[in-house]
């Protein structure tokens, strides 16, 4: 239920008719300012200066460093992402970012095809299938991010237009502003993912060198060329070996790992940006407690709440495919890692990497779910104050706002199949436990076999 259309540039009158009488006694009001259509997009009149977006606490300014970093590995091929003005962000097929994206997609497709042909030769099992799923998820993520990039200029314009009123009084900027929150969370995920990838490489290299040192039947001297041909043999069954191709494979593999992590990182940044504005609305509502408030204030609050809900719906329609892909990806890899919990490993470094990877994956999944669930939690936190509004301040707008907060599901979704709430996290945990018990029963014969001979 939408409220009346308001001009947010007008502040509600707190006097009972005094200012209206004074305005009638004044001479003619000056002619209205000319409104330019391009400026009206952000509620700015042509005779006024455009806002300095660099100094505003806006979502676009908070996320652009990480979106620019993602462009280095061919995610979100947008032009003008570093511009402070969101209206300069655009998508173009004929652009350098799009060209880089196509190159990375072709390279990832080669790795996917190499893995697929290799598995056809040796036979597909539940455990060696993980590599194919990994490259398949990365390729799907590239496609989803291209589709999202086409919609992003419209998304960031509507987002900026909606959140500009929140950068001015009566709304307050929290001590830890939006940029700070996004940066802390993003740097934590990037740092932990770099640690996970580094441990993977160290584990693979040490396992390779130990095997050569301990096996008398292996006369090969440890070298970069031999390491690549041993660990990435599935690629060189399709491509001829050369040191340049080997280095490129390592770079593409690292880029794929970044894309695999960036899906959750991007959802987390979106969730931070949306829940931050709902938190500001809640803070404003709480400050009105025990005060006599005129109806126009509640009209404005409900209007801003409705605008945020409309923004959430628009953002959700643009990125629900990414949310669905991320959840399926996390569900599969958590189940796969838990399946290997009882397996014996050969070297201590293998145990270190395995447990770090497992805990990181579970922690990242839970963190993203809880961050997204904060949107739903923040959208309802003002209910307690609204229900205690005094009879002197009670009005139909308060009743409408309570009804909307109570009945509407304000949350991101995966194609509307499910909503990212705290309840879903526990449901997903129960699903993982159920599948894991079934998988462990099927994998019992493989666990009894133990480790394969080292020098075979």
Curated annotation (Swiss-Prot):
Changing residue 196 to A: Abolishes sucrose- and maltose-induced currents. It is found in: Cell membrane. Residues 1-91, 151-182, 272-318, 374-421 are cytoplasmic. One of its GO terms (molecular function) is sweet taste receptor activity. Changing residue 333 to A: Abolishes sucrose- and maltose-induced currents. The keyword Ribosomal protein does not apply. Residues 115-128, 206-245, 343-350, 442-456 are extracellular. D-maltose binds at residues 196-197, 234, 253, 257, 353. Homotetramer. Belongs to the insect chemoreceptor superfamily. Gustatory receptor (GR) family. Gr5a subfamily. This is Gustatory receptor for sugar taste 64a. It comes from Drosophila melanogaster (Fruit fly). The gene is Gr64a.
């Amino acid at each position: 239920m939408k409220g009346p259309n308001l001009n947010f540039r007008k502040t509600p009158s707190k006097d009972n008719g005094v200012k209206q009488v004074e305005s009638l006694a004044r001479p003619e009001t000056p002619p209205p300012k000319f409104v330019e259509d391009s400026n009206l997009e952000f509620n700015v009149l042509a005779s006024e200066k455009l806002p300095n977006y660099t100094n505003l606490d806006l979502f676009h300014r908070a996320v652009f460093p990480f979106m620019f970093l993602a462009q280095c590995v061919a995610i979100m091929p947008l032009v003008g992402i570093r511009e402070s003005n969101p209206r300069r962000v655009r998508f173009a097929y004929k652009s350098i970012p799009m060209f880089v994206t196509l190159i990375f997609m072709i390279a990832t497709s080669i790795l996917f095809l190499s893995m697929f042909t290799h598995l056809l030769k040796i036979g597909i099992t539940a455990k060696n299938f993980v590599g194919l799923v990994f490259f398949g998820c990365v390729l799907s993520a590239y496609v989803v991010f291209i589709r999202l990039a086409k919609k992003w200029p419209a998304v960031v314009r509507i987002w900026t237009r909606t959140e500009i009123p929140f950068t001015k009084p009566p709304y307050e900027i929290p001590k830890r502003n939006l940029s700070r929150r996004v940066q802390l969370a993003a740097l934590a995920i990037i740092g932990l993912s770099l640690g996970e990838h580094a441990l993977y490489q160290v584990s693979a290299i040490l396992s390779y060198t130990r095997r050569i040192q301990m096996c008398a039947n292996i006369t090969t001297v440890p070298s970069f060329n031999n390491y690549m041909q041993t660990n990435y043999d599935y690629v060189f069954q399709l491509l001829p070996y050369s040191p340049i191709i080997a280095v490129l494979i390592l770079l593409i593999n690292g880029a794929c790992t970044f894309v695999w992590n960036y899906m959750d990182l991007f959802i987390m940044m979106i969730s931070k940006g949306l829940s931050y504005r709902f938190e500001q609305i809640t803070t404003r509502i709480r400050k009105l407690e025990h005060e006599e408030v005129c109806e126009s204030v509640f009209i404005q609050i409900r209007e801003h709440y409705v605008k945020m809900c409309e923004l959430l719906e628009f953002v959700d329609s643009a990125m629900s495919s990414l949310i669905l892909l991320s959840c399926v990806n996390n569900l599969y890899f958590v189940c796969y890692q838990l399946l290997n919990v009882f397996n014996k490993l050969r070297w201590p470094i293998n145990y270190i990497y395995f447990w770090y990877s497992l805990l990181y994956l579970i922690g990242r999944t839970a963190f993203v779910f809880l961050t997204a669930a904060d949107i739903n939690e923040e959208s309802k936190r003002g209910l307690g104050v609204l229900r205690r509004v005094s009879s002197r301040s009670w009005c139909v707008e308060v009743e409408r706002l309570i009804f909307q907060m109570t009945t509407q599901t304000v949350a991101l979704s995966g194609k509307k199949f499910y909503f990212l709430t705290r309840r879903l996290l526990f449901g997903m945990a129960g699903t993982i436990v159920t599948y894991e018990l079934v998988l462990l029963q099927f994998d019992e014969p493989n666990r009894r076999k133990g480790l394969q001979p080292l020098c075979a």
